[in-house]
Amino acid sequence: MASLCFRTSVVFALVAAGLALWMTATHDYRALHAEVVLFVLGWGSFMAYGLYYRTIAAAAAGLVKFHYVVALIGVIVEAVGIMGTEWGNPFFDPFRIIGAFIVAVGFVLFAIIVFATRETAAHR
């Protein structure tokens, strides 16, 4: 699972960097907030998840796959919602809100994984 998190992190970084280049070339910065979500929540969070799952082998069971799917969906839905909203389309506003909620659920799942596996990993 750690390797999948690392690869996902790299994909988010590449997409965010592509958005940054596009914004710079066009002088159109409406995608800025979506780019930040992709860098911070996509690249940063998935890199942290991967590092944790690689370091704490006991965390590789249980909720980890579910957490990955929830976190992935949350980042994508929030970024798409932010971009659509910033481009003036109110249709995307619920996606931004729902995506942020899903991201928060992903963080709660990660916290549960961390606190549930901490004792197990410490006693190996």
Where in this protein do the model-derived segments appear?
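Hydrophobic alpha-helical transmembrane segments of multi-pass integral membrane proteins
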Residues: M1-R124
